Amino acid sequence: MIEINNKIDYIFYTNNTPNTYKIQLILLELQKEYGITFESRFINVFKKENYSDDYIKINPNKKVPAIVDQTGEKPFIVFESVSILIYLAQKFNTFLPDFKTNPLENSEVITWTVWQAANLGPAFGQYFHFSFFSPTVQEYSLHRFNNEAQRILRLLDDRLSSTYIGGNEFSIADIASAGWLLYLNSAPLYNATKERFPNIFKWLDLINQRESIKQVNQSISDGFKNFNPSLLRALFTNDPELINAKAPIGIENVILKYD
């Protein structure tokens, strides 16, 4: 049963993946600046806890992240990572310019926040899946999503000729992309991409100084050490040969195939 804790401002449903890291980041930022309290509740998708009747009441889409805002007269649920980012940014009037006073800046930040969810996240998710988690080599999929990942990184590197993704200030546009791009801090991906995308790594060096980013970087590092691809495959197939197969590329070679 999903229990409500009225002593906590926000309940945060997570499973330590890129989209949930976005929400961890903004909650940590709000905790530092405004003293909010939040409680993280891990949803084990490998045990299909996201399909439980209790969790479906939180998120009928059966995915993470989700939050329950307990600061009002009654608990209010928000799911989908970008929706949560916009909700919290608007509520605290931070990391997102106010539309009434700065409509153009507001639109620019929202545009790049939504861009992440529509482009960066899906492309990187598919590329990592077929290169690291897929039990068989699928050259077409690898080629397609490798090319798309390159296109997105080139676009973002051009964009980051400015200081931050959404403009001149740190915003939810940076938080949204950080959930995925902080993985580039890991040694194999760092070595493969740093020289090719200097502005992205200049941006990473800048945001890596934030305490919230440092905490999420540690979570990502721990995840690399502990994750077993077979657990993910078991969500999609019952074939033991596919579940236990060796990854076709492996994390050490991800994003190395440049045309």
Swiss-Prot record:
Gene Ontology molecular-function annotations: glutathione transferase activity
Stored Pfam families: GST_C, GST_N
Domain GST N-terminal: 7-96
GST C-terminal domain: residues covered: 102-232
Family the entry assigns: Belongs to the GST superfamily.
Lineage, top ranks: Eukaryota, Amoebozoa, Evosea, Eumycetozoa, Dictyostelia
GO terms under cellular component: cytoplasm
The name this protein goes by in its record: Glutathione S-transferase domain-containing protein DDB_G0274705
SUPFAM superfamilies in alphabetical order: GST C-terminal domain-like, Thioredoxin-like
Highest rank taxon of the organism: Eukaryota
